[in-house]
């Protein structure tokens, strides 16, 4: 599934199947990471990794 812009407010949940607290979250196929810096192909992103502001990859994928 391609990333989708859920247009959710910061701190709000979005309709990606799991709770998302990112503004304009990008939902990936695993539906466990909503941040755009967590690519769908990174399996570690479903393990509670976080995204640094301005980063292209989540903390687990660096």
Swiss-Prot record:
Keywords: Acetylation, Metal-binding, Metal-thiolate cluster
GO cellular component: cytoplasm; nucleus
UniProt region (Alpha), positions on chain: 31-62
Residues noted as binding a divalent metal cation 7 in the record, renumbered to the chain: 51, 58, 60-61
Positions of modified residues (N-acetylmethionine): 1
Entry binding sites for a divalent metal cation 2: 8, 14, 16, 27
Stretches for region Beta: 1-30
InterPro entries: Metalthion_dom_sf (IPR017854), Metalthion_dom_sf_vert (IPR023587), Metalthion_vert (IPR000006), Metalthion_vert_metal_BS (IPR018064)
An example molecular function term from Gene Ontology annotations: metal ion binding
GO annotation terms (biological process): cellular response to cadmium ion; cellular response to copper ion; cellular response to zinc ion; detoxification of copper ion; intracellular zinc ion homeostasis
Binding site for a divalent metal cation 4: 34-35, 45, 49
Residue numbers binding a divalent metal cation 3: 16, 20, 25, 30
Chain sites annotated for binding a divalent metal cation 1: 6, 8, 22, 25
Keyword hit for Transmembrane helix: no
Binding site for a divalent metal cation 5: 35, 37-38, 51
PROSITE patterns (UniProt xref): METALLOTHIONEIN_VRT (PS00203)
Any Pfam family hit: Metallothio
Binding, a divalent metal cation 6: 38, 42, 45, 61
UniProt similarity note: Belongs to the metallothionein superfamily. Type 1 family.
Reported function: Metallothioneins have a high content of cysteine residues that bind various heavy metals.
Swiss-Prot/TrEMBL domain comment: Class I metallothioneins contain 2 metal-binding domains: four divalent ions are chelated within cluster A of the alpha domain and are coordinated via cysteinyl thiolate bridges to 11 cysteine ligands. Cluster B, the corresponding region within the beta domain, can ligate three divalent ions to 9 cysteines.
Designated name of the protein: Metallothionein
Species: Xenopus laevis
Gene behind the chain: mt-a
């Amino acid at each position: 599934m391609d990333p989708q812009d859920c247009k959710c407010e910061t701190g709000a949940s979005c309709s990606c199947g799991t709770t998302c607290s990112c503004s304009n979250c990008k939902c990936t196929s695993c539906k466990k990471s909503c941040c755009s810096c967590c690519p769908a192909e990174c399996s570690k992103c479903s393990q509670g990794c976080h995204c640094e502001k301005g980063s292209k990859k989540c903390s687990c994928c660096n």
